[in-house]
C-alpha cells in the first residue's frame, strides 16, 4: 500500500497537494512537496474503502437485492452478472480477494449496456446519486481530515475518478476544494515524471 501511495503521488504532482486513489480500494495522502503523509489508517475493504470499486460494487448488490435499483437497470444487472445469493456469499466469504470480486460489479456503473433512451433520466439520476454519495463520503473521511485540504489542489488517480470527473467537481464545490489532476492510470503520470525530472 505504501508503494502504491508513493507512486500515486509522483504520478500526480511534484508540488504540495492531496493525492487520492480510487481503485479497487481507496486511500489518500498529503504531499508537502517533500514527504508523503498518509490519512487515517485503513481498516480494509469491509470497513472503509469509500468511493472505491469495492464500495460501489457492494452498493450495487445491496440496491439490487433491496429493490432500490430502477427496474430496467435491475434487469440488465441480472443479465450481466451471476446474482445467485449462494454464489455471491461463496465469493465474498470463502474465496480469496473478495474485495476484487466486489469491485468487479462496479464496472456496471460506467458501462450499463444498451438501455433505452426513455429510461436515461431515471438511470442517470440513480447513478449520479450513487456516485455522489460515495464521493462525498470519501471527501469527508479522506480529504477533509487534512488541515491543508482547502489550501492545496486535490488530485485523483484511478478509473473511477476518470469516469466520474464531473461528479467529483460537483461534490468538491460545497467544501471549497480545488480539483487538481485526474489520472486514469498512474503509469502515465510516472512516465511523465521520469521524462521531466529524471532524464533531464
Sequence positions of predicted segments:
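ATP-binding/phosphotransfer module of carbohydrate and carboxylate kinases, centering on a glycine-rich
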Residues: 11-18, 61-200
Amino acid at each position: 500500500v505504501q508503494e502504491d501511495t508513493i507512486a500515486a503521488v509522483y504520478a500526480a504532482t511534484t508540488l504540495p497537494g492531496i493525492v487520492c486513489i480510487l481503485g479497487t480500494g481507496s486511500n489518500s495522502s498529503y504531499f508537502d512537496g517533500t514527504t508523503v503523509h498518509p490519512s487515517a489508517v485503513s481498516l480494509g475493504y469491509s470497513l472503509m474503502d469509500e468511493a472505491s470499486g469495492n464500495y460501489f460494487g457492494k452498493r450495487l448488490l445491496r440496491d439490487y437485492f433491496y429493490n432500490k435499483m430502477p427496474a430496467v437497470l435491475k434487469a440488465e444487472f441480472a443479465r450481466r452478472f451471476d446474482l445467485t445469493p449462494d454464489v455471491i456469499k461463496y465469493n465474498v466469504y470463502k474465496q480469496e480477494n473478495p474485495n476484487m470480486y466486489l469491485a468487479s460489479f462496479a464496472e456496471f456503473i460506467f458501462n450499463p449496456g444498451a438501455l433505452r433512451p426513455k429510461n436515461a433520466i431515471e438511470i442517470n439520476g440513480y447513478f449520479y446519486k450513487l456516485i455522489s454519495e460515495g464521493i462525498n463520503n470519501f471527501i469527508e473521511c479522506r480529504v477533509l481530515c487534512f488541515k491543508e485540504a482547502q489550501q492545496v489542489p486535490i488530485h485523483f488517480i484511478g478509473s473511477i475518478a476518470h469516469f466520474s470527473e464531473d461528479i467529483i467537481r460537483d461534490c468538491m464545490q460545497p467544501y471549497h476544494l480545488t480539483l487538481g489532476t485526474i489520472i486514469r492510470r498512474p503509469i502515465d503520470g510516472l512516465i511523465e515524471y521520469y521524462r521531466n525530472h529524471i532524464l533531464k
